[in-house]
Regions:
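A short, basic N-terminal segment
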Residues: 1-42, 47, 207, 211-234
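Post-Walker A helix-loop "phosphate-sensing" segment adjacent to the P-loop in P-loop NTPases
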Residues: 69-80, 89
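Walker A/P-loop nucleotide-binding motif
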Residues: 48-64
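Short regulatory helix/loop adjacent to the ATP-binding pocket of P-loop NTPases
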Residues: 131-146
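C-terminal helical "lid" of AAA+/P-loop NTPase domains
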Residues: 182-186, 193-207
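Conserved AAA+ ATPase "sensor/coupling" helix adjacent to the nucleotide-binding pocket
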Residues: 148, 162-175
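Conserved AAA+ ATPase "SRH/arginine-finger" region at the nucleotide-binding site
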Residues: 148-160
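Conserved nucleotide-sensing/catalytic segment adjacent to the nucleotide-binding pocket
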Residues: 87-127
Length: 234
């Protein structure tokens, strides 16, 4: 009879589809996003019918845009099919998320802005860069974008990142000690998207091993993800 020890079986976690809450009550506010949050909160009292929310990937633009879309009952417009949405828009507000991800549909965006202005409605555009960096060639569109109100959202600071990480664990009904959260804040890239991936990985690993999420496990997980840099790219 062999005395060789075998590792205990690993629990395979079920994908329960933990969703990230996109309600206003779930929003964590700090100095890096306060101006952008204030703009969303004051809708429809906007300084311009067209607002551009600009900031780096992972800064929370999509979260804010989702909150505004629900509040304003806005139509989410596909950047590849802007023209198809104009006819059915009516007086409803419109949202284009990540408008500068690819080539900007200049004619479509120009006509959409005109339609929104003509209907007395509003348009929210999110982008990584300010409109002046989009390389717009159509003079009329460039003029419209210059008249838009632009609000910058910055990469998360410590307060925001800690709040988001805590909320992400709470969304998964996982309790984590504050010192573990602070360790993650110091170690991971300053990106909300990265925070989501780290929390997801930690939760799955803890379930597989049937262990709580400790600082040691956090360090091991972050180091493993660091070695596979592709998982940290946004």
């Amino acid at each position: 009879m062999s005395d060789q020890k075998t590792d205990p079986p690993r629990q395979l976690p079920l994908d329960l589809g933990h969703g990230t809450a996109y309600s206003r009550d779930d929003l964590v506010v700090s100095g890096t996003n306060a101006q952008a949050v204030a703009l969303v909160d004051r809708w429809p009292d906007w300084p311009s019918p067209v607002v551009v929310l600009a900031g780096p990937a992972g800064s929370g633009k999509t979260h804010l845009a989702s909150i505004w879309r629900v509040r304003a009952n806005a139509v989410a417009v596909d950047t590849r099919r802007i023209g198809d949405n104009i006819a059915n828009l009516g007086a409803r507000p419109a949202l284009i998320d990540d408008v500068d991800t690819g080539a900007v549909d200049e004619q479509g965006l120009f006509h959409l802005i005109n339609a929104v202005r003509g209907a007395g409605s509003t348009l929210l555009l999110t982008a990584r860069r300010f409109p002046s960096a989009w390389g717009v060639a159509l003079p009329d569109l460039a003029s419209r974008l210059k008249a838009a109100a632009t609000v910058e959202i910055h990469e998360p600071d410590d307060l925001l990142l800690a709040g988001v990480i805590t909320k992400l664990f709470a969304d998964r009904q996982v309790e984590v000690e504050p010192h573990v959260v602070q360790y993650l804040v110091r170690r991971i890239e300053r990106s909300l998207a990265t925070a989501m991936r780290v929390v997801e990985r930690l939760d799955r690993t803890a379930l597989e091993r049937k262990t709580p999420i400790t600082r040691t496990l956090a360090a091991e997980t972050v180091s493993a993800m660091d070695e596979g840099q592709g998982e940290f790219e946004i």
